[in-house]
Amino acid sequence: MTPSLANFLWSLVLGAAIVLIPATIGLIFISQYDKIKRT
């Protein structure tokens, strides 16, 4: 594996983490808040 390919893969992994982690936290927070609001 070339260093540039490794850097590209790491940027994909980090990009996915930066997008998915806040999205997951946001969805969990919204679902919890919505459940509380609905009752």
Swiss-Prot record:
GO BP terms, alphabetized: photosynthesis
Could you list this entry's UniProt keywords, alphabetically sorted: Membrane, Photosynthesis, Photosystem II, Thylakoid, Transmembrane, Transmembrane helix
How does this polypeptide assemble, per the annotation?
Answer: PSII is composed of 1 copy each of membrane proteins PsbA, PsbB, PsbC, PsbD, PsbE, PsbF, PsbH, PsbI, PsbJ, PsbK, PsbL, PsbM, PsbT, PsbX, PsbY, PsbZ, Psb30/Ycf12, peripheral proteins PsbO, CyanoQ (PsbQ), PsbU, PsbV and a large number of cofactors. It forms dimeric complexes.
> What membrane topology was assigned to this protein in its record?
Single-pass membrane protein
Subcellular localization(s) per the UniProt record: Cellular thylakoid membrane
Q: Does the keyword Membrane apply?
A: yes
Q: Which GO terms describe its cellular component?
A: photosystem II; plasma membrane-derived thylakoid membrane
Question: What family does the database annotate?
Answer: Belongs to the PsbX family. Type 1 subfamily.
Could you identify this protein by its name? Photosystem II reaction center protein X
